[in-house]
Amino acid sequence: MDSASKEETLEKLDQEITVNLQKIDSNLSFCFHKITQDIIPHVATYSEICERIMDSTEWLGTMFQETGLVNLQANAAAPVGNAPVKSVVSNNVGIFPTSAEEASRESQTDNGPNEADSAVHVNRDVHSMFTNDSIDDFHTANITSTGQILKLPDSSDEDTGSEAVPSREQTDLTGEGHGGADDEQDESTIQRQSRKRKISLLLQQQYGSSSSMVPSPIVPNKMRKQLAHEEHINNDGDNDDENSNNIESSPLKQGHHHPKGQADDNNEGPDEEESTKEVPKPGTIIHFSTNR
């Protein structure tokens, strides 16, 4: 009984193995047919399309390269009436010649002087069609060589009061005649005077409108030193007043209030006199010496 049961199980296993092998075989055959019948033809068509694209791109590249050698004069010359037509292009040479020498040789041998002139006119007409007339007029306009020579402005340092040295070009231009040099000297003196007037007006406006002692950027060095000294004196006076007020506020120093106030009044007198002497009053005009 045991041997019979074993044989039955072996047969069942053999049958299952054969069934699975048949399934595997059928699947492999299906894959093979799918690859050979569906995938390979599509790949072949795709490769053909790629080859066509490569051929067309190569043809376009050669066409663009040969367009620079097109003989426009041979194609532009047209027959007139019943006149005999000359063989403009030979049988071996197409519309795109192989080299520039052949194109020039064809234009010299095949085309006469009249045909060459007509071709030049045709090319000019085509150029005028694709270009703007206003731009051509702008590029072909008459250019005049005459012009006005501009003078360089006089550069001077306001702090030091130094005058600018004339450049070499101005000296060369003004060295032709003595009269021209005199005129320019007169103009320079007028400019210096006007500049000094402007400085004086600015100083007057500053000291007339505000009471601050901030030096302006156009004030000379001497004025700046005086203003800085006055600011220092005023600041010292303010500090002394603050210290005196602090001392007087204490109860121990109540008895010394009047002498300290008198001393401060006596000390403030000369400072005010010095400030009135050094600071110019509003409305004064400051004159500067000219070093020529």
Swiss-Prot record:
Q: Region (Disordered): which ranges?
A: 99-118, 149-194, 226-292
Among the record's GO biological process terms, what is one? mitotic sister chromatid biorientation
Where found in the cell? Nucleus; Cytoplasm, Cytoskeleton, Spindle; Chromosome, Centromere, Kinetochore; Chromosome
Q: Which residues carry this modification: Phosphothreonine?
A: T140
- Acidic residues: bias regions: 265-275
Name the Pfam families on file: DASH_Ask1
Which keywords fit this entry according to its UniProt record? Cell cycle, Cell division, Centromere, Chromosome, Chromosome partition, Cytoplasm, Cytoskeleton, Kinetochore, Microtubule, Mitosis, Nucleus, Phosphoprotein
Name any GO cellular component annotation: DASH complex
Where are residues bearing Phosphoserine located in the sequence? S26, S118, S134, S155, S156, S200, S216, S250
Principal localization? nucleus
| Main function | Component of the DASH complex that connects microtubules with kinetochores and couples microtubule depolymerisation to chromosome movement; it is involved in retrieving kinetochores to the spindle poles before their re-orientation on the spindle in early mitosis and allows microtubule depolymerization to pull chromosomes apart and resist detachment during anaphase.
State the oligomer form and interacting partners: Component of the DASH complex consisting of ASK1, DAD1, DAD2, DAD3, DAD4, DAM1, DUO1, HSK3, SPC19 and SPC34, with a stoichiometry of one copy of each subunit per complex. Multiple DASH complexes oligomerize to form a ring that encircles spindle microtubules and organizes the rod-like NDC80 complexes of the outer kinetochore. DASH complex oligomerization strengthens microtubule attachments. On cytoplasmic microtubules, DASH complexes appear to form patches instead of rings.
Q: Which family does it belong to?
A: Belongs to the DASH complex ASK1 family.
The entry's protein name is DASH complex subunit ASK1
Taxonomic lineage is: Eukaryota, Fungi, Dikarya, Ascomycota, Saccharomycotina
